[in-house]
Regions:
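Conserved alpha/beta enzyme-core scaffold
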Residues: 1-348
Length: 348
């Protein structure tokens, strides 16, 4: 079977009404070529339509890229997502009651991929208790037309937990750096690896398919097997992307310090401009504890490690991001999710 095909042929494998899981983290690791072609196909032919979209991190640029390509009335009918803030076109559909919409914790969705892959009935965790995700409050539902309960409260050994129900995934859309002709894929030029393997396994265990976007295709047997992150036995279609649709982040085509190809000199890292965000970051940096493991989130926290580096205390920090990098200096803006000079990069 020839797995290498055009983007249009690949997305023609998606059926109306399918549940589609899409990888990525802001602009890192998002299969932009595929979401562009889904958008174009729907606008030209009305196909595919009525999709259920599932994603963990928020893939988007707050404008038109990423999941915003799918924010068209009729293309999607339901969204189960972690971070919505960078996909305003999906947000608009949810606010206007044009789609069913759920907001679940990002990490829970990552674990759901693993549990769907394992054939489990769902994910059990304390995360979300007594928040808007708790079914006794909103159950993660974002509008009036969203009725189905996909989260419930259970009790184990007299302790309450939330049970997030598993569901079949018909199609998974992923991105890698290189793939061989069979579909074995490596991610050496990606800033993060994210949930790729779990998402692929979740689709295959649901009887679904995996469509992979790559920068280049190489001959079978030429990839280092230790670097293969997604085995070809899980891949159904491979699409070669245009370079502009395979940027390492939405801000940069390629930065070798994000994926460990080089170590950037700290003196070459530009500082933040002096504004209210930098002032807040500087004040927050004063609370940092040397050698403590510190997790930074999106938004204002992005600047904390930059300020720490400017002040000469960055080397004493162990900064982590939920996207996977440990150590280094987290990038900001549309490169958030990547880190400059990371010590290691784990799955999300």
């Amino acid at each position: 079977m020839n797995k290498i095909m055009s983007s249009y042929d690949a997305i023609s494998l998606i059926k109306n009404g399918d549940t589609v899981a899409v990888g990525g983290f802001i602009g890192c690791g998002h299969p932009e070529e595929l979401t562009i072609k889904i958008n174009e196909s729907f606008l030209e032919k009305g196909f595919p339509n009525n999709l259920t979209l599932v994603y963990a991190a928020g893939q988007g640029d707050s404008k038109d890229k990423g999941l915003n390509r799918l924010g068209v009335e009729g293309l999607v009918s339901k969204v189960i997502g972690g971070h919505w803030g960078l996909a305003p076109k999906l947000v608009k559909l949810a606010i206007e009651n044009k789609i069913q919409a759920y907001n679940l914790p990002q990490g829970v969705i990552s674990h759901l991929y693993r549990d769907i892959a394992a054939g489990k009935p769902g994910t059990i965790t304390h995360v979300g208790l007594k928040t808007f995700v708790d079914p006794r409050i909103d159950g993660g539902k974002l509008n009036d037309i969203t009725k189905e309960d996909i989260v419930k409260v259970i009790e184990i050994d007299n302790k309450e937990y939330l049970f997030y129900k598993a569901f079949p995934i018909n199609v998974t859309l992923l991105r890698a750096s290189y793939a061989d002709e069979f579909g074995n894929a490596t991610m050496e030029k990606e800033a993060v690896t994210l949930d790729g393997l779990s998402m692929a396994q979740a689709a295959k265990n649901s009887g679904g398919i995996v469509i992979l976007q790559v920068e280049k295709i190489v001959a079978n047997g030429t990839l280092d097997p230790r670097k293969v992150k997604i085995p070809g036995i899980l891949v159904d279609a491979i699409v070669i992307s245009k370079p502009e649709n395979h940027m390492q982040t939405y801000a940069e085509q390629y930065n070798p310090s994000y994926n460990g190809e080089i170590k950037m000199a700290l003196t070459n890292i530009p500082g933040l401009k002096l504004d209210e965000r930098k002032i807040i970051s500087r004040r927050a940096a004063m609370e940092l504890i040397p050698n403590a493991i510190t997790n930074l989130g999106i938004g204002v926290p992005e600047g904390i490690s930059m300020v720490a580096n400017e002040e000469g205390i960055g080397s004493g920090l162990k900064v982590t991001l939920e996207s996977g990098p440990i150590g280094g200096i987290p990038a900001g803006g549309l490169s958030f999710g990547a880190s400059i000079n990371p010590e290691s990069i784990l799955d999300q």
